[in-house]
Structures are given as structure tokens and as C-alpha cells.
């Protein structure tokens, strides 16, 4: 802009090819088997909520009971959890768009209301070892793999549960703009780029 350099040194450079992981999505039958097995393992509420919202793993595990209004079904997503050298850290989500309010289906709110009676922690999904801290991302990842294997489902990453939610939402007629807001994407273009 100030013409300090006569030519752009980046002109002619080739960008590396986009390397994206193959997106995996659970089919409807797999989803049913998965949720039945998750219930048997004591993780039904965690995985049901994720499959109904498409939350990122760190967002899901950072949820506290104060984030859910049982009267309206409004769930506030305003923090995330991640691990640094074995220590859990809580921070704000990755973008401003990631801070959002979702309205849960009444059936999910009722499942969470009943589950709440069994949990003695401010965290929605506390550690099974220490109730005053949330369950760790690594523990949930390992549990996911166990449940998938026992349910006879294909092996997927936790993030693929988010893809499953998005794919099923689009198949059921949700518009891209609404889905984009639910997923916490900065723009609908991001959602379109991933899911079309």
C-alpha cells in the first residue's frame, strides 16, 4: 500500500495442498447402537448432548449447570477446556462466534434434568475420579473409542460427532445459516465449505 517494496515477493509462490482429514459420520443405525452402548457405559447424557448440539469437545466438557436454563432450555456456550501438560485449562472459546446460546429440544432438557439429580458437581460432566473438576478430554476420547467398539460402530474421532450432528441437521432441512450459528462458525461460508 505504501509501495515500500516494488514487487510482491509472494507472487508466484505455490501454496501447499489443502490436507483435510476425511470426515466420518455415523449412520442412523450406528447412532442408535452407539447411544444404547453409551447409556450402558454411563455416558449417555454427554454424548446425547453433543449429538444434539454439535459442540466442540472442549466446549462440551467446560459446561457447568449454571450454563443451562432448565425453564427455557437455553444452553450458554462461553468457555472451553483443554489440557496443557496434564493440567486442565479453562478459557474463552476460539472465536467470538463460538460464544453462543442454543435452545435444546425439550426431551434433551428432561434427560439432563434427571441426570442433574445424580451429579454432585458444578460441572455438567465431572471427572469420575474427582467431582470438583470436569472430565478430561483424553478420558472422553478413550471412552468414545470403547463405546464405538462395543457398539460395533466404525472408529471415528470425537470431532466427527460434530460432523454427524451437522450432516443430520442439513439432511433434516436445517438451513446453513442456522447451522453455522449453532456450530459457532464465524460465517456460513465456513459451514458451506466443510459440509458441501
Model-identified regions with their sequence ranges:
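Catalytic-site neighborhood detector that most strongly recognizes the C-terminal catalytic loop/helix
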Residues: 17, 25, 81, 183-196
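Active-site/catalytic core of tyrosine-dependent DNA strand-transfer enzymes
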Residues: 25-29, 72, 79-86, 105-154
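Basic, Lys/Arg- and aromatic-enriched nucleic-acid-binding interface segment
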Residues: 5-65, 70-71, 82, 97-99, ...
Amino acid at each position: 500500500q505504501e509501495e515500500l517494496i516494488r514487487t510482491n515477493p509472494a507472487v508466484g509462490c505455490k501454496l501447499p495442498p489443502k490436507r483435510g482429514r476425511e470426515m466420518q459420520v455415523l449412520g442412523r443405525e450406528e447412532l442408535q447402537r452407539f447411544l444404547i452402548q453409551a447409556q450402558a457405559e454411563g455416558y449417555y447424557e454427554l454424548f446425547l448432548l453433543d449429538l444434539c448440539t454439535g459442540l466442540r469437545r472442549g466446549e462440551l466438557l467446560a459446561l457447568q449447570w449454571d450454563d443451562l436454563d432448565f425453564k427455557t432450555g437455553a444452553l450458554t456456550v462461553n468457555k472451553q477446556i483443554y489440557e496443557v501438560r496434564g493440567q486442565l485449562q479453562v478459557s474463552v472459546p476460539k472465536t467470538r462466534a463460538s460464544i453462543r446460546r442454543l435452545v435444546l429440544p425439550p426431551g434433551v432438557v428432561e434427560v439432563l434434568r434427571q441426570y442433574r439429580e445424580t451429579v454432585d458437581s458444578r460441572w455438567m460432566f465431572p471427572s469420575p475420579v474427582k467431582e470438583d473438576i470436569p472430565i478430561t478430554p483424553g478420558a472422553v476420547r478413550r471412552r468414545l473409542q470403547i463405546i464405538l467398539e462395543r457398539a460395533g460402530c466404525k472408529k471415528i474421532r470425537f470431532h466427527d460427532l460434530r460432523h454427524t450432528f451437522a450432516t443430520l441437521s442439513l439432511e433434516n432441512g436445517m438451513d446453513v445459516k442456522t447451522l453455522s450459528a449453532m456450530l459457532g462458525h464465524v460465517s456460513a461460508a465456513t459451514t458451506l465449505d466443510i459440509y458441501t
